[in-house]
């Protein structure tokens, strides 16, 4: 059993157009991964940046090897750390799914990490035209 602190900083009035269930599942996948790998703290932000919504999920967990960062969105790919995790390690489809959903919504996803310190996933999605006007 872990005791995890989750901090959320979410701007109000953020509207995007898209498939709600898929987008919700994509963000949930990132949060589930953060819970799985964090030592104690997860930070979630959703902020407006001009015409885009930027969602970031950061954990202070095991991190991702630099050589793996370019491959983590590939189908069925698992890092060595993930394969060695004793429980709930999945089959390597979660980040692949997130990547596909984000790109289908004309967005981008990136990951940055420092081994043993943190991992941050950033999703950038276009805001709804209703909000931009």
Which ranges hold each PLM region?
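Short conserved segment of the HATPase_c
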Residues: 64-77
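Conserved catalytic submotifs in the C-terminal HATPase_c
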Residues: 5-14, 50
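Glycine-rich nucleotide-binding loop
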Residues: 52, 63, 92, 115-122
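Acidic ATP/Mg2+-coordinating residue in the GHKL
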Residues: 59
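Short beta-strand/loop element within the Bergerat-fold HATPase_c
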Residues: 41-51
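Short alpha-helical Gxxx[C/S/T] motif in the catalytic ATP-binding
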Residues: 94, 98
């Amino acid at each position: 059993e872990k005791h995890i602190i989750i901090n959320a900083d979410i701007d109000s009035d953020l509207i995007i157009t898209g498939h709600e269930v898929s987008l919700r599942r994509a963000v949930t996948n990132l949060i589930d991964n953060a819970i799985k790998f964090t030592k104690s703290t997860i930070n979630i932000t959703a902020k407006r940046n001009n015409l885009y919504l930027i969602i970031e999920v950061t954990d202070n967990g095991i991190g991702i090897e630099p050589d793996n960062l370019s491959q983590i969105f590939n189908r069925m790919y698992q890092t060595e750390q993930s394969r060695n995790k004793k429980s709930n390690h999945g089959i390597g489809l979660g980040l692949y799914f997130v990547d596909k959903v984000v790109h289908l919504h004309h967005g981008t996803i990136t990951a940055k990490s420092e081994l043993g310190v943190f991992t941050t996933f950033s999703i950038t999605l276009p805001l709804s035209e209703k909000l931009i006007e």
